Amino acid sequence: MQTQDIIESKLDKCRKGIYGPPIGKKCIAFIDDLNMPNTETYGAQPPIEILRQYMDHSGWFELKEKTFLKIEDMMYVAAMGPPGGGRTFITPRFLRWFNVISVTEFDNEAMMGIFSSIMKHVFEKNQVPTNIKGQQANAIQATMDIYESALQSLLPTPSKSHYLFNLRDFGRVVMGMCMANTFIMTEQAQFVRLWCHEVMRVFYDRLTDDRDRLWLIELLRERVKTRFGQDFDKICKHLQTDENGDAIGIPQARRLLFGDFEFPDSKRTYEEMKNPDNVIQVCNTYLEEYNSVSKKPMELVLFLFMIEHITRICRVLRSPGGNALLVGVGGSGRQSCTRLAASIMDYTVVEIEISKTYGKT
């Protein structure tokens, strides 16, 4: 019913019993994730069946009066992924109406060309130093290594169903690097740490157990050496909490922070925040400002683990089209972190309250 209502809302009544687009125009209905609807007990997929009815009979039955509505000058363009992983099979009776075009995965050369062009454009626009600009190809190649390794090793399971990676994740690493003010970087180590941070935000933050996290850190260590010619433990030495610390592991890698709010009185620049204690103090200042104007002040004790999540949310909020899904048990501070991060980024949080009168308006 919802599918039918959506399509009918975009059509005009041409004459009695006939609907279509405005005179002289064609209506193209784009249907994304065509094979997403689940099958019912007997194998039917209602959204698919109503679409097929139009293809078979050039219309469907009106829901109230039960009269047949003929639809003219409308065509479908649909997209879908291969069946599996929650995607179902499309019946041959419906599929026969389409010209099927298979869009294969990009090869490595195409991916290198796409993302290298993006990074090159940003670097030239920001007048990045030559020694940093020369690392862009290494960054793209290293990101491709991480992406391909994640596809092969971080496979989805019933307990890790969210271990799904696609080309958008590759792009998020590149876009994250483009957000940074690379024009103020003077050392290659700064650029490599930026790359490590963006890889961790895209891939590491999705991991749910320490075995997978250690696997990714070891992969980072290897790629930093082979692609950038740098020593991972050496360039991240400042993350150690003691002088005789071991190799960089999970506790140290978590201290690699980037953000644009460490210095509130200056222009916001996305850069490394090397002093976690100073970041905690700054966040406490933002918390005081939030409580001074909020009707529901938050009594929070900020500590490093919480700051890590706040910086991650801030990064998502400053990313174009950024959306965050915070997964955790109740009472773990997801809402508090989000409210404080939104305040830091000068956003207002609006919470939808479900009630009996809740509707589209």
Q: Each predicted region: which residue ranges?
A:
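Flexible beta-alpha connector loops of hexameric P-loop NTPases
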Residues: 1, 36-45, 101, 300-301, ...
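Conserved catalytic/switch belt of AAA+ P-loop NTPases
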Residues: 6-16, 26, 30-71, 75-77, ...
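Walker A/P-loop nucleotide-binding motif
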Residues: 318-337
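Conserved AAA+ ATPase "SRH/arginine-finger" region at the nucleotide-binding site
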Residues: 1, 68, 80-82, 99-111, ...
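Short regulatory helix/loop adjacent to the ATP-binding pocket of P-loop NTPases
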Residues: 66, 82-97
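Conserved nucleotide-binding/hydrolysis micro-motifs of P-loop NTPases
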Residues: 34-37, 76, 81-86, 105-111, ...
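Alpha-helical lid/collar subdomain of P-loop NTPases
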Residues: 72-77, 96-99, 106-320, 345
